[in-house]
């Protein structure tokens, strides 16, 4: 199940990349002005935020009917893939409303492939193996991030119908394989009655606040600062080969770091990864040579891989058992809110304003370090809650 989720996340993320590459052209075909494209991306993130949390909670309510949940995930995915496949065909019809409607259907149903599969991993993968499973889950996203710049170059002049069709078919096939694995293992790894009470209250609140800070820090560091940072020291034609450095670090460390998460716990390793990422982001912001910048970006990506894998493992542990989908859905929703905020800043042209540039330079490091302190507190609170049932 965990291995299948790697492929699901890979094809889901690659589909998003294909969508972003072709959205300006599709919007123009549908009669939407170019200025509306960022607003469509903003709408997507708002839908992700709402649906990720809602579907995660739904997965908790269906905890006793795994086969029914598997069927629901597959059905939602088939609807999502169908809508995605239709996008390059409905755009030439020249109807902005139709393009937006199909996009909304795709965005809403694709959320079935984030929190619900994680909830299933939380129930069906034994606790000690969950960090490794979380690493596999996130590795698919990391691989997609690494190949995205090359995909942008390769698809620049291609007919959009073929990439959309290949992405939709690949995602549907991977999801069918994953849901088959769910049906083959319908019983939880640990009986419900023998598992400790979920950790609620202060540790979860501190964890989610840290996730919000980490998500915002990542959006500023990679989506806003990375390309301009490289262009300070490198040629524009080298950018597609430099941007994947972050994701190479992410992919190389994510599975080895899961071994440390297994031993020390998700919040503790998130705190370590956040602190390391904050320091690496500070070096990136002040790098005076391309070599230093590349090395710092590599370590920033490695730290982010540790953070994200540990965050998923921590969400599953905090939600155990019966609330895995709720906590995992909240995590994904907050990451979508972070992306929403970044797109809103771009629409407002904040990154182009000279007064904001120094703030954007040091903000990722500051937010990641602050999140590290919060997570250290969350780890302490979690240990107290595990030993004292009176802890809120």
Describe these PLM feature segments:
Residues 83-90, 94-113, 292-306:
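Hydrophobic core of transmembrane alpha-helices in multi-pass small-molecule transporters
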Residues 1-48, 206-210, 215-232:
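Helix-loop boundary and gating motifs at the non-cytosolic
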């Amino acid at each position: 199940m965990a291995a299948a989720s790697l492929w699901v996340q890979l094809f889901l993320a690659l589909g998003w990349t294909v969508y972003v590459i072709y959205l300006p052209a599709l919007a123009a075909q549908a009669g939407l002005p170019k200025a509306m494209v960022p607003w469509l991306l903003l709408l997507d993130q708002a839908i992700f935020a709402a649906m990720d949390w809602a579907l995660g909670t739904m997965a908790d309510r269906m905890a006793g009917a795994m086969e029914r949940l598997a069927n629901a995930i597959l059905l939602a995915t088939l609807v999502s893939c169908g809508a995605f496949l239709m996008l390059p065909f409905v755009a030439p019809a020249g109807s902005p409303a139709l393009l937006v409607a199909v996009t909304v259907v795709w965005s809403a149903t694709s959320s079935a492939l984030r929190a619900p599969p994680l909830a299933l991993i939380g129930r069906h993968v034994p606790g000690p193996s969950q960090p490794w499973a979380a690493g596999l889950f996130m590795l698919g996203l990391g691989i997609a991030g690494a190949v995205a710049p090359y995909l942008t170059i390769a698809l620049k002049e291609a007919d959009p119908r073929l990439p959309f069709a290949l992405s939709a078919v690949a995602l549907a096939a991977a999801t069918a394989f994953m849901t088959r694995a769910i049906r083959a293992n319908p019983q939880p790894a640990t009986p419900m009655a023998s598992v400790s009470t979920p950790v609620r209250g202060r540790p979860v609140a501190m964890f989610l606040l840290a996730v919000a800070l980490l998500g915002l820090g990542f959006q500023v560091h990679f989506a806003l600062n990375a390309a301009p940072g490289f262009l300070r020291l490198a040629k524009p034609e080298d950018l597609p080969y430099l941007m994947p450095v972050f994701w190479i670090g992410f992919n190389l460390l994510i599975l080895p770091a899961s071994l440390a998460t297994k031993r020390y716990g998700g919040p503790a390793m998130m705190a370590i990864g956040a602190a390391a990422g904050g320091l690496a982001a500070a070096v990136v912001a002040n790098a005076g040579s391309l070599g230093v910048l590349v090395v710092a970006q590599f370590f920033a990506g490695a730290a982010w891989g540790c953070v994200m894998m540990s965050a998923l493992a921590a969400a599953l542990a905090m939600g155990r058992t019966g609330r895995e989908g709720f906590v995992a859905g909240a995590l994904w929703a907050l990451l979508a809110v972070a992306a929403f905020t970044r797109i809103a800043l771009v629409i407002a042209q904040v990154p182009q304003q000279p007064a904001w540039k120094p703030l954007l330079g040091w903000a990722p490091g500051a937010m990641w370090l602050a999140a590290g302190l919060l997570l250290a507190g969350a780890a302490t609170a979690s240990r107290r809650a595990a030993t004292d049932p009176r802890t809120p």
